[in-house]
Amino acid sequence: MISKEQFDKEIELIIANAIREDVGDGDHSSLACIPDSAKGKAKLLVKDEGIIAGIEFAKQVFAYVDENMKVDTLIEDGSKVKYGDIAFYVEGASQSILKAERLVLNAMQRMSAIATKTKVFVDLLEGTDTQILDTRKTTPGIRALEKWAVKIGGGTNHRFALYDMIMLKDNHIDFSGGVAKAINKTKAYLKETNRDLKIIVEARNLQEIQEILDCGGVYRILIDNFNYEDTRKAVALIGDKCLTESSGGINEKTVRHYADCGVDYISSGALTHSVYNMDLSLKAV
């Protein structure tokens, strides 16, 4: 996984690029009708229900736009919210509040939706030892925000990107000439380049799982698109030789059944690619 320093840098880049994209050479709507000296106050109003996420990110946005803005937080990230709740108040230059408004809302609406969906999966897994993982099926440019939201919702982050963990999937295996060749080439590459990266290998059937185990040195086996019966067989075959992960179209109706098969992790792209934004507003008070 990436370090905190790397993650913080990603957040800084997201904010800078989003403000560049949205503000350009100036918020001319505000500049045209609001004096530089005008002060204002606004509230973040919840118009939905679920798990709130992105409050700490909003603070960073306000600070980036204008370090003199003050935020009074009433509700923390990860809290359950309902219609009518006020998450925070922000106070400062009216122009600055308006400049930050859309980025704050866009981010918080999506992050809250992801956190809410993640919490549904987490609750469905309660009582098992299985953790829910996100994937790289994220919105380009804001992956750090979406993975942050998964953690706020109680989920666990998978690898951040292609560079912080090795995952040998079906195409890697086929292009390499088979499971054993892919794994052995990977081990040689890591040794040659002096890299310490964990290896995950996708298995499409029980025979490939045995091939992976025979090679050894794998951190986790991805049991992809298996039915329940074969998943249980795979878990029994793997035992404590490495960790296990189920994936492949797993949803709210099936996630508990896969957890009951004994896997350590379940990954779901739906946490980030299939959500409906939470309805939030930033209103002047």
Predicted regions and their residues:
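Active-site loop ensemble at the mouth of alpha/beta enzyme cores that anchors a bound cofactor
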Residues: S281-V285
